[in-house]
Structure formats: structure tokens, C-alpha cells
């Protein structure tokens, strides 16, 4: 309980950090930098991986990627402009079958398939929804990814709910999990219960401010006001994990309004 109370104090006293954090690994630390929404940069041993790069992020300090992973086909996951900016010639871009229709210069991994790209082992994990609603992700159209770096396994869930394929994951060291707000799927406690099924050492929440993300993609009109319930939902997630031995790292995934 003491660790949870300390976390609550930290959440209340400061804004979440978008600064890089590290994970010990063979051959040196893995450096993780949240960018925006579902977009994240991972570096290890000189290799740079970008997941769902999106042009609304500040790329001024983002190095060219050695590998790009795309989890879904909407613009906040698949952004050809961002890929072109951050991709050197010949750099592999791993996409879903649905994304291939919008981005022809990518390598498709279907759910459950594996491959090695830029020397990095990648496994595609099914990402889909089971609860009706909009948006809805049918099975087979989106991917999560397990990436192995320095003996560590990192899981990027992308989109979707806590499907059996996620619950069956083993040996995950770091997980990035979506919390879809205001869509009534993957609320904080269900996300926490999902995390408990496969027990990563560290978990990040991302992909949670859908209303603001939609505005970021269009810039039409004034930005929506801050969601007053976002800090409370993040605290609810942290509370649901209290005592589980899973480290929750809060991060700033969105630019200031």
C-alpha cells in the first residue's frame, strides 16, 4: 500500500514525464521515449525502432529509424508522411494487411506470424475488439507486436481488447497497453486485469485520449478541453495493480492543449 500511496502523490504533484526511461538489457540499456498517443521510440545498441510514428509528434530530436512497426491503418497509427521523414532507404516497415492497402512499401505480418527485421525478432499478436462499438477492430486487421531486444521482450498492444492471444503471452518485460477513452472498452480496471494475466515487469498506458487525438489529426476548431476524468482513470489503473509487483510508468503521451 505504501508504494501505491507514493505513486498517487507523484501523480498528483507533477505532470507525467515524456522524458526517456530505461530498461536494463544485455548489451546496454533499452531507452524508451513516448512520442504521442500510440507512438513510441525504442533504442538499444544503436538500433532505433519506431512504433506508429505520427506527424503530430515533435520529431526534432528523433533519429532516423532502423525499423518501423505499424499496428493499424488509421492515420494516427499509419502516417506515410511520418514514415517518409523518419525512414532511411531500405529500412523495413512492418504493417498489417489492412495497412498495406494504404502503404504499399511495407512488409505484411499477419496475426501470429514472426520475422526478423534489421536484426530484430518481431512477432505479430492479434489485436481486435470483442465488445460492439465504434471504432471496431475485427480480428485479423490489426497487430500488436512482441519485439525482442537485448534479451528483453517488449509488447506493443496497439489497439483492441484483452483477447486470448494477449492473455497467453509469456515472458513480457515491458508492455504498452491502450486505454480507450471515452470509448467504453478497455477502461482502467479491465486493462489492469488484462495486465495481470500475462504479468509484464513494467507497463505503460497509452492511446487513451481519443477525443484530443482526433483533434490533433485535424486541427479543426479549438482543441477539446482536458478530460477531467483522465487523472482519476490513471489512478484507478495504478490502484488496481497495487501489490502485484508490476511497475507502472506514467508518461505524457499528448502535447499540452
Predicted regions and their residues:
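Bacterial N-terminal signal peptides
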Residues: 3-14
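Core dinuclear metal-dependent hydrolase active-site scaffold
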Residues: 19-63, 108-170, 252-257
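Structural recognition of the beta-strand scaffold that forms the well-ordered cores
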Residues: 34, 48-52, 69, 94-95, ...
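Active-site metal-binding motif and surrounding structural segment of the metallo-beta-lactamase
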Residues: 55-98, 170-176, 199
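A short acidic, amphipathic alpha-helical/loop segment
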Residues: 81-86, 165-168, 189-194
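Binuclear metal-ion centers of metallo-dependent hydrolases, dominated by the metallo-beta-lactamase
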Residues: 107-115, 201-257
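Charged helix-capping and loop-helix junction motifs
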Residues: 138-141, 187-194, 223-231
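Proline-aspartate-enriched helix->loop->beta-strand connector
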Residues: 172-176, 188-211
Amino acid at each position: 500500500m505504501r508504494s501505491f500511496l507514493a505513486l498517487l502523490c507523484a501523480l498528483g504533484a507533477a505532470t507525467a514525464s515524456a522524458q526517456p526511461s530505461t530498461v536494463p538489457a544485455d548489451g546496454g540499456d533499452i531507452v524508451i521515449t513516448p512520442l504521442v498517443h500510440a507512438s513510441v521510440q525504442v533504442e538499444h545498441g544503436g538500433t532505433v525502432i519506431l512504433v506508429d510514428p505520427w506527424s503530430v509528434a515533435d520529431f526534432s530530436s528523433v533519429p532516423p529509424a532502423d525499423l518501423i512497426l505499424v499496428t493499424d491503418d488509421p492515420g494516427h497509427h499509419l502516417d506515410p508522411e511520418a514514415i517518409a521523414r523518419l525512414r532511411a532507404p531500405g529500412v523495413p516497415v512492418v504493417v498489417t494487411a489492412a495497412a498495406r492497402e494504404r502503404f504499399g512499401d511495407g512488409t505484411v505480418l499477419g496475426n501470429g506470424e514472426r520475422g526478423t527485421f534489421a536484426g530484430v525478432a518481431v512477432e505479430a499478436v492479434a489485436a481486435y475488439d470483442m465488445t460492439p462499438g465504434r471504432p471496431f477492430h475485427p480480428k485479423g486487421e490489426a497487430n500488436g507486436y512482441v519485439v525482442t531486444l537485448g534479451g528483453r521482450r517488449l509488447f506493443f498492444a496497439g489497439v483492441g481488447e484483452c483477447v486470448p492471444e494477449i492473455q497467453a503471452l509469456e515472458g513480457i518485460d515491458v508492455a504498452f497497453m491502450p486505454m480507450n477513452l471515452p470509448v467504453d472498452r478497455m477502461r482502467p480496471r479491465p486493462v489492469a486485469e488484462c495486465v495481470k494475466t500475462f504479468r509484464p515487469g513494467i507497463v505503460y498506458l497509452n492511446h487513451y485520449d481519443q477525443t484530443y487525438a482526433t483533434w490533433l489529426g485535424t486541427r479543426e476548431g479549438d482543441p477539446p478541453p482536458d478530460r477531467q476524468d483522465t487523472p482519476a482513470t490513471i489512478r484507478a489503473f495504478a490502484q488496481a495493480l497495487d501489490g502485484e509487483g508490476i511497475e507502472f510508468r506514467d508518461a505524457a503521451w499528448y502535447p499540452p492543449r
